[in-house]
Amino acid sequence: MNPFISLQNTFDPKPFSIYMLSLLFLMQFAACSNENGSVVENKPAEQLSEEEEVQKPGIGTARDISSFDLVAEMGVGWNLGNSFDVESKDKTYWGNPITSKAMIDEVKAMGFSTLRIPITWGPNQVEMSPYTIDPDYLTEIKRVVDFGFQNKMHVIIDVHHDNSWIKPMTSETQKSTDRLSSLWTQVANFFQDYNDSLIFEILNEPRIEGITEEWSGGNSEGRGYINDFHKAAVDAIRATGGNNEKRHIMITTWAASTVPIAMEELTIPNDDEKIIISLHSYFPWQFAGEAAVTWGSESDKSALIAELDKIKQNWIIERDRPVILGEWGTIEANPLQSRINYADFYVKEAAARGLLTIVWDDGGNFRLLNRNDLSWDFADIATAIVAASQ
C-alpha cells in the first residue's frame, strides 16, 4: 500500500548453599527463575504450560503441511500498516505510535488471528555488500512478531517500501538480486527456529515507479525480473536450513496486481510446494481508495464477484496454489454503512472461494483501530470482517 494515498527467558540460576540440599533434591528439583524473579520447576518442553510456553514464542518444529492447509488455519487478518514500513529509522514518522503488546492483544481480542507486519528495510540496511541489517532493527521486529505468537496468531513479515533499491530493470537487477538475497538470508537465519506460524513474504507490490504501466500489470521485462527476484530469495531462505526448509513463503505479481497478464506471467520458483500467492485487491479503487463513487448495487456486487472468481480460477483451480489477499480495505471518506456492507460482502465472498483476507489498517484514512488509545474508531467494520470470515 502506498502510504501517501492514505495516510528470554534468561537462565538466571539462584545462588544457594549446596550443603543445605540433599543430593536427591539437587537431582529432582533443580530450578530456574523467570523474568520476574520467581522460581519455577524445570520441565521438558512438551510439559510446559501455556503460560510458560509464552516465554519462548515461536520456537518449535515446522510441520510438513501443505500451504493450502496452512492458509485454511490462519484466519482473517489485520495489517500493522505505516509502522515498520515507514521509510525512516523513526518508526513513528508517519504518525503511529511504537507498537505495544497491548495493541496486538486488542487486535486478537477483536477476532483477528493473522498479523501482517509490513517492513521497510532500506533505512536499517547497509547499502553496500554484504548489505548488513542493523541487528537492533531485527530485534525490534522480533519483539512484535513475538506479540503475535503470544496471541497464538500467524504472523507475516515482508519487504515493503523498498522499491528505491529493488528495481526490476536491466541496469539494476544484479545489485537488487544480491541485496535481496542477503536480506532474506539474514532474516531467515535470525528467525530460523520459529515454527511455521511465521510466514515470509518476499516482496510487496514490486514495480518500477513512475512508468505508465506501474499500476496496470507492468511490462514483460519487469515481470521476468520479479520472477528472478523471487527465485533468488526463495533459494536464499531454503539454504539456511532448519525450519526454513519447510517455511511457507509468499510471492506476488507485478505490484501485487490481479491484472490477467501479471498473474499469468508469475512463475513459481523451483515449483516449490510451500509457495502462497499474495495479491492486493482494493476493488473497485474508485470506491475503496478514492470515495469517488458509491458501492452496493447488484452490478457492484457482480463486479466484485467477477474479480474474486478471476483470482480463484487463475490460482486455485488452474495452478493449484493458495491465495492470500494481503491488502484490501476502504477509506473513511466513504459512508460508514457502505463500508460495513462492503466489508461483509468482500470477506464473505472471498472466504467462500478459499481466499484469505488481511485488511489494510494504516492508522490513517484506512484505519480501523485507534493505536493511541486502543479503541476501535470503526468497530462496526472490524466486527463485520470477523463475522463474515467465520
Feature locations, PLM:
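N-terminal secretory signal peptides that target proteins for export/translocation
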Residues: 1-14
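C-terminal motif of bacterial Sec signal peptides marking the signal peptidase cleavage site
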Residues: 28-31
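Bacterial signal peptide processing site
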Residues: 33-35
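N-terminal carbohydrate-binding accessory modules
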Residues: 43-114
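Acidic/histidine-rich helix-loop elements
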Residues: 80-99, 127-133, 172, 286-304
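An active-site-proximal structural segment forming one wall of the substrate-binding cleft
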Residues: 97-98, 104-113, 132-159, 169-202, ...
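Active-site region of glycoside hydrolase catalytic domains
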Residues: 178-293, 300, 306-331, 352-355
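Substrate-binding cleft of secreted/luminal carbohydrate-active enzymes
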Residues: 305-377
